[in-house]
């Protein structure tokens, strides 16, 4: 990835393996997070977000949802995201942790991946809760202190759901092309 680029390529690396198999791959990151119909719009759609706006320089989405208690929203995140991800070999598909600031969620902010540090951006947009993939201990403490609930639903689980949407768009645009979504790509962690 661009955050940690390859210094050299060997037979164990995906580009070599793809070439040997005569396959190609499309790899997208931040541009797909911010794109219309991209990672965070798909994530917002899973939670039936209305009146959506962008935040975090266009990457995240914030909008209205049907009022729900934080524990129920966390459980819904676990169930809905699991339905959009490849199931692990063992353990739960999605592990969710949350901080409940003590008020129901009417306005939700979502940002996939490692978005926990963006809690202040979510607060500035009037969100009651930030749902992201990863948040560290200090993000959780600060968010709760400032009145924002926080749900960390896993990096993989918040990003993988977009693959079906991208595949559908490619199939519609290029009907002669066989478009496959990996059934092997899974969260690298095994959860207890």
Residue ranges and their predicted role:
Residues 1-192:
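Hydrophobic structural segments
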